[in-house]
Amino acid sequence: MHIHEYQAKTLFRCRDIQIPKGILIDNTTKINDVCKALGGDVWVVKAQIHAGGRGKGGGVIFCHSIEKVERVCNQLLGSKLITPQTDAKGLPVGQLLIEAKQNIERELYLSLLIDRQTHKITVLSSTKGGMDIEKVASKTPDKIIKFGIDPLGSLSVQDCTFLAKKLGFNTELTKQFNNTLLSLYEIFTQKDVNLIEINPLIITQENKLLALDGKIDFDDNALYRHKDIAKLRDISQEDEKERLASEYQLNYILFDGNIGCMVNGAGLAMATMDLIEHFGGSPANFLDVGGGTTADRVAKAFELIQTETNVKSILVNIFGGIVHCDLIAQGILQAIKTVGLTLPIVVRLEGTNAPEGLNLLNKSKFNIHVESDLTKAAIKIVKLTK
């Protein structure tokens, strides 16, 4: 689960990580008071959306007058912001964070994430922070400092000091950096975080270390342990269909293709999409109905797929282990009748009671083509779509 920048900064402030003074708004009635309360003569208006690249998308704007602040706020509030990290539709802007401009001496990058290769929490830091950090990582990876933390151990002050030296900090900045990194590590480990990032982490002309931005991604599966974090969820930033799918324990991701996919198991779902692509088709979605597939869940899956106007056909690929294929077939027939589906469907069943399930589907009056071989099923669905 992602949260907004202002929410991340609130968590930072509670852990004594230094952040700029900012005021959150959702309307423009008191812009003059906001700017005066922040002080200074240049302000930064920052759109609050769950995506990076806001600066490149026009969502972070410097204003040299209160009049411009008001004009920019009116333009952004209620709009949809498109950035390099959103789709073509963009994300709705319902809130803005206004901050006074900082006197920046240097921009750095700092994050913690789970490294799947080393199986460690890894600190990433760089002296080249800012909007082009992705370019730095791809073109000059030597500029990124990596430090792995033993999952059975902890992050020490000595570890932080080691990284501070790598970044060229003096004694005062090292003290501030150590506090910042140790606090980030506490949030990461205590709140079941997947990624926590400050970009940029700035050094001001006053020799202060400030988190100018904040990004946190929490493990959805651990939210039951963190009711305070779960309350920070903003469903306006989520794809509506993906949100509805999650309520039925369906893992659903929308693509741009025209062949709907319904599969049980993430690995099998990816293999199914690969085969469709291999034979010249284009998947419209990733949809994993999970191991405990029920008729209701299958019906909801068909309903989600059918709402996409670009979908021309559907491939169902089920491997019956604990779940019996004949029960799955009954669920498919019930779901098709309930949803009123008329698109051509190819169903591949394999596993427990697969012959019985395929026989049930063959006898039905619906537009269903059955296969026991996945390759043949992929070829068939591509032909039907063309």
Curated annotation (Swiss-Prot):
- Cofactor(s) needed for function: Mg(2+)
Which residues are noted in the entry as Mg(2+)-binding?
A: N199, D213
Q: Which reaction does it catalyse?
A: succinate + ATP + CoA = succinyl-CoA + ADP + phosphate; GTP + succinate + CoA = succinyl-CoA + GDP + phosphate
Q: In which pathway does it act?
A: Carbohydrate metabolism; tricarboxylic acid cycle; succinate from succinyl-CoA (ligase route): step 1/1
Q: In its keyword annotation, does this UniProt entry include Metal-binding?
A: yes
Mind telling me which PROSITE patterns this protein's record contains?
Answer: SUCCINYL_COA_LIG_3
Q: Which GO terms describe its biological process?
A: succinyl-CoA metabolic process; tricarboxylic acid cycle
What UniProt keywords apply to this chain's record, in alphabetical order? ATP-binding, Ligase, Magnesium, Metal-binding, Nucleotide-binding, Tricarboxylic acid cycle
- Cellular component GO terms held in the UniProt record: cytosol; succinate-CoA ligase complex
Q: Which residues bind substrate?
A: N264, G321, I322, V323
Its quaternary organisation is: Heterotetramer of two alpha and two beta subunits.
Its biological purpose is as follows: Succinyl-CoA synthetase functions in the citric acid cycle (TCA), coupling the hydrolysis of succinyl-CoA to the synthesis of either ATP or GTP and thus represents the only step of substrate-level phosphorylation in the TCA. The beta subunit provides nucleotide specificity of the enzyme and binds the substrate succinate, while the binding sites for coenzyme A and phosphate are found in the alpha subunit.
Q: Which protein are we looking at? A: Succinate--CoA ligase [ADP-forming] subunit beta
- The gene from which this protein is expressed is sucC
